[in-house]
Amino acid sequence: MAEAKVFTLRPSLLQIACLNSFPGGVSTSRGDMFASEIGQAPPVQGAEVKLIQTGMEREYGKYTHQIKMPVNGVIQRVVNQYSANGTMGLRYQIPTTVIFQDMDYGGGSLRDKRPARFGVVHIPIYSLNHHVLGFDFVRTPAARSLQNGIAIPKDTVLARSPSIDNNGDYRYGKNANILLGSFPEVRQDGVVLRRGYAEASKFKGYGEMTIQFDGDEVPLNLYGDDKNYKIFPDIGEEIRPDGVVFATRRLIPGLYPIQLSRRALQQYMDTDDGKIAKEENARVVSVEVIYAPKGKPTTPVGMDAQPRQYLERQRQYYQELRSAYDEIRQRHGSNFVLSPEFQNLLVRGEMNLIDHGRDRQRITFVESGSPLSEWTVKITYSYDITPTIGHKLADQNGGKGVVVDVWDDDRMPVDADGNVADIIMDGGSIVNRLNPSRTFEIDINASFARTRKTIIESIKMDGSRENYLKMFNWLLEAYDIVSPRFADIVRRVDPFKHIQS
């Protein structure tokens, strides 16, 4: 009998396809589809470690979107974009700017005669490389422990994608129980999705809007009360259920007493000019204010109290950056240089800090050649997107489909072991698309789910060391079939250490 040959595919030649557990069972075109789809997929909030891993997930996890320390540096100052004091109650993570001295350049070395160099690294709260889809950064312990005077090595990760877990594994999707069947809904690459699975697979969307107002129209008090005038939601707060973020009202002579009553200013009417977010359950994540007075303030007193608070917070942020720069200048005189990012930040700060009194040079803020209104507020908000009809799903084998229906959990098929189907798809497409490895993954995952259930039930009934060893050896026999190399690795482990842990 001929001996079977084992061919090893080199990960360096497979590139992204090395994340596929069964690349030998996928046609070239389908493998290429997986490579393109994984770059288009947004991070899933319920992401999981893949059940059948290739060993390359952690390596790819090193190159996902991250905020890293660019050089070996010593922290000079940590500046939060919004300070902790004040009257605004911010209930959300806030951006942070870290000022550091580059210890690989100039003043960081006795042998290097170049001047000391200082730079900044900005830790944002979210990443948005798409006009809608993005994710909230997860700050690492290194970021949470930043303080003046400590040294940070180059490439220290300060914030990472939520797709990376604490072990460094790249979780680019979510495991699913897939049923291949001849349901009428799954024709033409249709997919039926379990509602509970969809709810656990949400991803982040973002929206932006710019609001402007001055004395011609008054901003409404849509988020305040009789004592607090609040014209838009604060950072971390949800947008109203009707989606109105901000609205202004044009005053009509003779109707001022009606239009400007406390109750009227807290009510949005169809005749008002409103900025509306179409997405549900949206939450504000960023507010940026530009104040461009054209002489005497035109907005009625008190109606601009909220944007003035944000303006003051912005000025405090830039004042602290300027203070850090002044401290560097006092220590080093003129014998230092700034990174382009730090230089640009200071210039932007001067624009925000300049006074607008009569004895100072005025700055004119324009957009597309036209002067801005007295107040301009840029609001960024985030919201959860739940997969639903019209969304596209894909797997590691180039298998894909469009959701045509979402069924309640109790309507989905259940197998003899009580496993509920998460996704229903057409099995015939596997033959048509030449990606039979889809069935490999489904069958092996189902087999090991049953194996796991059997082992757990057996150990519950008999927790002796003898039975534990028996179940361990039985599991090794399954590994011998699926991955002999992995089985050899597991055999080197003392199974009884698991009992102690």
Predicted ranges, named:
Residues 1-387, 392, 497-501:
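Long, charge-dense accessory insertions within large macromolecular proteins
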Residues 176, 185, 192, 197, ...:
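Intein-associated homing endonuclease modules of the LAGLIDADG/DOD-type, together
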Residues 251, 409, 445-449:
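Short, well-ordered loop/turn and helix-capping segments at boundaries between secondary-structure elements
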Residues 151, 238, 280, 386-389, ...:
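Helical mechanochemical/support elements of P-loop NTPase systems and associated helical scaffolds
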Residues 379, 390-392, 400, 404, ...:
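Single-stranded RNA-binding surfaces
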Residues 125-129, 403-420:
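Flexible glycine/proline-rich, aromatic-decorated loop/lid segments
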Residues 184-186, 252, 291, 399-400, ...:
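Conserved nucleotide-binding/hydrolysis micro-motifs of P-loop NTPases
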Residues 440-501:
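Long C-terminal interaction/binding lobes of large macromolecular proteins
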